[in-house]
């Protein structure tokens, strides 16, 4: 509703379905000007990227935002230029197997927080895990509200800039 308040001529397609390889056929990519990937599964992300590339539809993909605390660490880059992000590393390897070498992504240069066996939150370093965060008996949430939302805003900005050719 909000999009139509801003632009009554906008076409908004809402799908109440997860995009997975087995549901991909329910989406007609010829209707899209741009694809925004915020899928949490690698198989879904790979299928979406492969299909968008095959249909020559521009796509931007969000890499890992879970277990991050710094919303200012996001960057926009080609997947081939990413570092630090474990999801980007997996995506880069799997995309290469599919003959895809370029994908516009939003990724974080922050190392993800990990849990030690004691339940301590720490950061992975070359030497191992450091205890620089806090102690908790509860598992760390997968993400903080303020981190993935920033990735979404960055992706939205990139889509607008690409579609309007604003640079």
Features from the language model and the residues they span:
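Adenine nucleotide-associated cytosolic modules
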Residues: 1-167
């Amino acid at each position: 509703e909000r999009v139509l308040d801003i632009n009554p001529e906008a076409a908004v397609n809402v799908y109440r379905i997860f995009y997975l390889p087995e549901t991909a056929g329910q989406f007609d990519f010829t209707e899209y000007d741009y694809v925004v990937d915020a899928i949490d599964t690698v198989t879904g992300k790979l299928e979406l990227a492969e299909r968008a590339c095959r249909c020559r539809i521009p796509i931007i993909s969000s890499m890992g935002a879970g277990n991050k605390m710094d919303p200012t660490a996001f960057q926009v880059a080609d997947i081939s230029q990413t570092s630090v992000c474990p999801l980007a590393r997996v995506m880069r390897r799997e995309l290469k197997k599919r003959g895809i070498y370029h994908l516009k992504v939003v990724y974080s240069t922050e190392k993800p927080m990990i849990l030690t066996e004691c339940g301590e939150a720490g950061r992975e370093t070359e030497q191992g895990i450091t205890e620089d965060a806090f102690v908790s008996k509860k598992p760390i949430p997968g993400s903080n509200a303020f981190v993935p939302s920033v990735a979404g805003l960055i992706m939205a900005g990139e889509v607008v800039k690409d579609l309007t050719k604003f640079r």
